[in-house]
């Protein structure tokens, strides 16, 4: 019989890249750049590749093509905007590249494993979902497991016919599979706006990550070496993007999450809802 305290929080649903693993969310970003270059000899900047992060990968490619700077160069080069056939070709190039390299970016973000274990010790279930498709997720899940990260549920962006973010379906699939009885007892944690929107749309508490993810775009070494001015610049850049989604909380990295959990527990016990 466990003596662990019972938390009013039933589950936390984490994103993957930039949230729990892959500091800076570099695995998908660098592969988008490579896929555009390989298929069409088209140069994409890392900044452009990052812009719509959090969407499913086909939708992400489509969204990149609609960025004004990308669209202008594409039309100048090919005479017309990117169409569905172009997106399909880039996606088909993206998939094997991503599958080949995603395991290289499976290392947990500092303190992620301890934070997750702390949640499990309180009998809080660990859900997860991602903009990665299932065939990429299966590789990443295995690689992350080798590091010690084993969530109770994994939902990929193409698992559900209804689609992925910013709609709530992946988060709600976690709710069903984990046996959660009330969505307001769930927290959605993400480093990108579509994932925060997903949490809101599912009726959950939402937490955005400023420094470990896509928006700040720092490598782990850059983060570890950063002075306060660099850190603040990263925070400001990420906050400008994430605040538009009105997350309930914004923190630097997963290391700061236990304080948020304690505050949400207090608010739930006082009768608040997201």
Sequence positions of predicted segments:
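N-terminal helical cap/lid subdomain that shapes the substrate entry/recognition surface
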Residues: 5-113, 117-122, 138
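Conserved phosphate-coupling serine/threonine residues in phosphotransfer and NTP-handling enzymes
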Residues: 19, 130-132
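Glycine- and other small-residue-rich loops at beta-strand/loop junctions that grip anionic moieties
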Residues: 105, 129, 163
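Asp-based, Mg2+/Mn2+-dependent phosphohydrolase catalytic module
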Residues: 2-10, 113-118, 133-135, 139-274
